């Protein structure tokens, strides 16, 4: 009887908070013990949106009894329970440790219709040396989680830079894209080594992205741009003086060199809907790139996305060629360079001036 009275009071309180005609929750005792009616009502926008068709909604939050090195995450999911194997690696790649989780089935009653969604409530450990201000990092983390969940961003440990370096998910995609290009251009270090180096020196990683952004931000005037780039180069060089490991120093310097060798990018462009373009593209001057094998093209364009990446090599302002699919994921640039060299030989023996008769 006492339990029934408690449940009745919870439901009564929740109904009092809800507008007339609003959906009502059908939840079990475990949910009622975990969340107050006020907390449940505060979540109704996410609950109803998920029940009405959105695949997933999330919220990072901190309970009153949690310290600054703890955080919680609510995942509202439409289509049944999300496996831990999908949630945990994503969160670990953002830098969190997962300490516990609770799962609740929530019935959303609207008229005679009841839709059931799932709530995963997860408790997280915040990385050491990170003071996580939810007002600042909350939106960035939610954006990153959803981008990875929907497959528009790679699920790897480059994403730790969101917390470590104070970047957003698209900023991190730029650093990841340069790492992919460095792999093709002959750097001897693995992607794991590169991401670990950036994570170890997050202030330098942030400066490298700022160097990229300052070089191409259309809002900057030319004088302001040159002054900003000069200041950033000095700051980065000073910071590199504190990197004792030679391999890490080389990795970071190759990043700086790749950014300095970039002539154009589509990073600041928007699509027809006003959203950032899904693919990143960088146009390089190969003569400026360190470590690039010969022969060096006149220009080189690198395109990167979560599902495809590639290079376009051209040895002159006017060039002809075609598209080719490669299954050599680790060194497709070497394959493309070989094809371009063969085309150069063909072009050398083609008579440039000819005649035609009818």
Go through each PLM region and give its residues.
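Short glycine/proline-enriched loop/turn "hinge" motifs that connect secondary-structure elements
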Residues: 112-114, 340-343
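Non-catalytic interaction/regulatory segments
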Residues: 1-96, 100-309, 317-328
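Conserved small/polar residues in nucleotide/adenosyl-binding loops
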Residues: 356-358
């Amino acid at each position: 009887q006492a339990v029934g009275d408690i449940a009745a009071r919870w439901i009564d309180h929740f109904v009092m908070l809800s507008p007339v005609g609003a959906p009502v929750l059908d939840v079990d005792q475990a949910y009622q013990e975990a969340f107050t009616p006020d907390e449940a009502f505060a979540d109704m926008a996410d609950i109803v949106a998920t029940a009405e068709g959105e695949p997933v909604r999330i919220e990072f939050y901190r309970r009153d009894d949690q310290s600054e090195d703890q955080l919680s995450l609510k995942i509202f999911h439409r289509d049944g329970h999300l496996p831990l194997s999908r949630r945990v690696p994503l969160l670990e790649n953002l830098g969190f440790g997962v300490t516990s989780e609770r799962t609740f089935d929530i019935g959303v009653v609207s008229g005679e219709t009841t839709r059931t969604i799932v709530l995963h409530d997860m408790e997280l450990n915040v990385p050491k040396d990170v003071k996580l201000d939810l007002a600042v990092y909350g939106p960035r983390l939610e954006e990153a989680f959803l981008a990875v969940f929907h497959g528009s961003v790679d699920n790897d440990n480059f994403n730790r830079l969101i917390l470590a370096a104070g970047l957003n998910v698209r900023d991190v995609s730029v650093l990841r894209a340069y790492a992919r290009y460095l792999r093709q251009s002959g750097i001897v270090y693995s992607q794991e080594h590169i991401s670990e180096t950036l994570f170890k020196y997050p202030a330098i990683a942030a400066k490298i992205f700022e160097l990229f952004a300052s070089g191409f931000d259309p809002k900057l005037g030319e004088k302001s741009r040159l002054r900003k780039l000069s200041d950033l180069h000095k700051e980065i060089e000073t910071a590199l003086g504190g990197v004792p490991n030679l391999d890490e120093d080389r990795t970071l310097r190759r990043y700086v060199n790749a950014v300095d060798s970039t002539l154009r990018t589509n990073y600041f462009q928007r699509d027809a809907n006003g959203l950032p373009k899904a693919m990143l593209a960088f146009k390089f001057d190969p003569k400026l790139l360190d470590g690039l094998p010969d022969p060096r093209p006149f220009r080189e364009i690198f395109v990167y996305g979560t599902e495809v990446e590639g290079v376009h090599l051209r040895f002159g302002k006017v060039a002809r060629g075609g598209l080719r699919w490669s299954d050599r994921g680790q060194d497709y640039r070497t394959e493309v360079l070989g094809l371009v060299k063969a085309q150069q030989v063909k072009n050398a023996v083609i008579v440039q001036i000819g005649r035609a008769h009818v």
